[in-house]
């Protein structure tokens, strides 16, 4: 399988502490963005995840093959940007608008948009400092394929409430799991 930990690599850096420790000067408000996104995802839950257990699927979360020790700062931040972009696109579909509370979804979009703008400058800054290519093509492809699988699943399940719950939980679990890579990146410094 293609390098798949690009997903968690990217999500690790959603917290300000991880990004700031990597030398990127983001606004202090960015430090709360990761926590706020997780809180909003939790609040968006409309049905019990237990009622959807038979709908679960292995989406091949891109976290197993991408070694955290080999990730460079600029690459990790570029992956964060890609993950945020893909998450934004996933939750911006017409089916998403019908599935979630409009106010919570708007807050989620707004937070993702702000993080994307903050990271764009950060990615360029880190790429210039390291003088390295921003992303291995396999890593970016793994992230895109992962989100494509989530999108296909939603289509296959006709954007059902359980399908959205599975996708919401998948994204939330990945956001939460990202702290492991954050620790590895901090130890590298």
Swiss-Prot record:
Keywords: Antiviral defense, Cytokine, Disulfide bond, Secreted, Signal. It comes from the Eukaryota. One of its GO terms (cellular component) is extracellular space. It is found in: Secreted. Residues 1-23 form the signal peptide. InterPro entries: 4_helix_cytokine-like_core (IPR009079), Interferon_alpha/beta/delta (IPR000471). Disulfide bonds join 24-122, 52-162. One of its GO terms (molecular function) is type I interferon receptor binding. GO terms for biological process: adaptive immune response; B cell activation involved in immune response; defense response to virus; humoral immune response; natural killer cell activation involved in immune response; response to exogenous dsRNA; T cell activation involved in immune response; type I interferon-mediated signaling pathway. SUPFAM superfamilies: 4-helical cytokines. It holds the Pfam family Interferon. PROSITE patterns: INTERFERON_A_B_D. Belongs to the alpha/beta interferon family. Produced by macrophages, IFN-alpha have antiviral activities. Interferon stimulates the production of two enzymes: a protein kinase and an oligoadenylate synthetase. Interacts with CR2. This is Interferon alpha-1. It comes from Sus scrofa. The lineage of its organism: Eukaryota, Metazoa, Chordata, Craniata, Vertebrata.
């Amino acid at each position: 399988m293609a390098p798949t930990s690009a997903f968690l690599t990217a999500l690790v850096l959603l917290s300000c502490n991880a990004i700031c420790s990597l030398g990127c000067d983001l606004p202090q408000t960015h430090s709360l963005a990761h926590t706020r996104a997780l809180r909003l995802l939790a609040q968006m839950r409309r049905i019990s995840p237990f009622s959807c257990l038979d709908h679960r699927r292995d989406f091949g979360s891109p976290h197993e093959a991408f070694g955290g020790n080999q990730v460079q700062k600029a690459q990790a931040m570029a992956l964060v940007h890609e993950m945020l972009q893909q998450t934004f696109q996933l939750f911006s579909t017409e089916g998403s608008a019908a599935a979630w509370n409009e106010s919570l979804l708007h807050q989620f979009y707004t937070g993702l948009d702000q993080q994307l703008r903050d990271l764009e400058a950060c990615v360029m800054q880190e790429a210039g400092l390291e003088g390295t290519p921003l992303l291995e093509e396999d890593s970016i492809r793994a992230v895109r394929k992962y989100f494509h699988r989530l999108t296909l699943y939603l289509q296959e399940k006709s954007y059902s409430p359980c399908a959205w719950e599975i996708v919401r939980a998948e994204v939330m679990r990945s956001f939460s799991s990202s702290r492991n890579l954050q620790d590895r990146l901090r130890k590298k410094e």
